[in-house]
Amino acid sequence: MEPNFWHDKWHQQLIGFHQASVNALLLTHWQQLEIKPQGQVFVPLCGKSLDMCYLAELGHNVLGCELNLSAVEQFYAENQLTVTCEPIGEHQFFDCEQVQIWQGDIFTLAPKITQDISGFYDRAALIAWPESLRQAYVKQLAKLIPQGCRGLLVTLDYPQETLQGPPFAVSPTWVETHLSEYFDITLLACRDVLDDNPRFIKKDVPWLNESAYLLKRK
């Protein structure tokens, strides 16, 4: 999946993956991570997610990474945040009081940038990758997460043959098989969200589960 795929989605505003409200599993389970309020939280492939605003409201300093420039600009504009921007290496660094975003390729993001984070939150990153790229993303995520750091992972699972992703189906078995090398994994919740997703209903997807996992870097 080439970067132009995502750039085209944002250019055409075909962003069904963007949620107009804070994720319900984030609201319910974030406190279980026991991350100090002032701790920095990393959000990979953050888009213009309102989840970042929620994390900031909890007192966290949010550090996002997003490929598409328009997504970053829309986030700050729509939330009326004053921001500065400077090019640093292969990325552009957007800075405001509580939400900083590195715009560029997450695969070239240096681990030193995230070395002081206290937590991380992945709702739309792991499920954005097809199988051919997902394992590479997991390896890069592991490089970016310091030992002992805890995070909340949110996934979707459904019969992949019924719908062309993204979002791609990520099963509990896949999570255990490919993430357990790097993380201790605890399943926090699994809920049926088919009724809330008309696109899946229209394609006759028989079931759609959203799961939340607590991850701890080994």
UniProtKB/Swiss-Prot annotation:
Family: Belongs to the class I-like SAM-binding methyltransferase superfamily. TPMT family.
Gene name tied to this protein: tpm
Keywords assigned: Cytoplasm, Methyltransferase, S-adenosyl-L-methionine, Transferase
Coiled coil: none
Record-linked HAMAP family: Thiopur_methtran
Name assigned to this protein: Thiopurine S-methyltransferase
Compartments, record wording: Cytoplasm
Organism: Shewanella denitrificans (strain OS217 / ATCC BAA-1090 / DSM 15013)
EC code: 2.1.1.67
SUPFAM superfamilies membership: S-adenosyl-L-methionine-dependent methyltransferases (SSF53335)
Reactions listed under catalytic activity: S-adenosyl-L-methionine + a thiopurine = S-adenosyl-L-homocysteine + a thiopurine S-methylether
One biological process term in Gene Ontology: response to metal ion
Primary enzyme class: transferase
Gene Ontology molecular function terms on file: thiopurine S-methyltransferase activity
Keyword Cell division: no
UniProt-listed NCBIfam families: PRK13255.1, TMPT_Se_Te
One GO CC annotation: cytoplasm
Residues binding S-adenosyl-L-methionine, per UniProt: 10, 45, 66, 123
